[in-house]
Swiss-Prot record:
Plays an important role in promoting lung pathology in both primary viral infection and secondary bacterial infection. Promotes alteration of mitochondrial morphology, dissipation of mitochondrial membrane potential, and cell death. Alternatively, inhibits the production of interferon in the infected cell at the level of host mitochondrial antiviral signaling MAVS. Its level of expression differs greatly depending on which cell type is infected, in a manner that is independent of the levels of expression of other viral proteins. Monocytic cells are more affected than epithelial cells. Is not encoded in all strains, and seems to be dispensable for replication. Keywords: Apoptosis, Host cytoplasm, Host membrane, Host mitochondrion, Host mitochondrion inner membrane, Host nucleus, Host-virus interaction, Inhibition of host innate immune response by virus, Inhibition of host MAVS by virus, Inhibition of host RLR pathway by virus, Membrane, Modulation of host cell apoptosis by virus, Viral immunoevasion. Residues 1-31 are annotated as: Disordered. This is Protein PB1-F2. One of its GO terms (cellular component) is host cell mitochondrial inner membrane. It comes from Influenza A virus (strain A/Memphis/110/1976 H3N2). The record marks N66 as: Low pathogenicity. It is found in: Host mitochondrion inner membrane; Host nucleus; Host cytoplasm, Host cytosol. Belongs to the influenza viruses PB1-F2 family. InterPro entries: Flu_proapoptotic_PB1-F2.
Length: 90
């Protein structure tokens, strides 16, 4: 079986566990994360980014000063349509 070459991606995703034993340190490599761990990490990061976007959106919404009802309706419909196009990613 052919052994996988280290690439910048695989090197950056390797986990390193450092444990202190006595007066010295021992470094133990735990190997590469499996696909499930990578997907969990990706979804966690994307969820945090989505929360940030929602917070920014609400701050923009609250910062509007005396907008007309028609403007608010148009803005809300545009947001809703763009949200539905993106769909649920997590």
């Amino acid at each position: 079986m052919e052994q996988e070459q280290d690439t910048p991606w695989t090197q950056s995703t390797e986990h390193i566990n450092i444990q202190k034993k006595g007066s010295g340190q021992q470094t133990q490599r735990l190997g590469r994360p499996n696909l499930t761990q990578l997907m969990d990490h990706y979804l966690r990061i994307m969820s945090q980014a989505d929360m940030h976007k929602q917070t920014v959106s609400w701050k923009q919404w609250l910062s509007l000063k005396n907008p007309t009802q028609g403007f608010l309706k148009t803005r809300a419909l545009k947001r809703w349509k763009s949200f539905n196009k993106q769909g649920w990613t997590n």
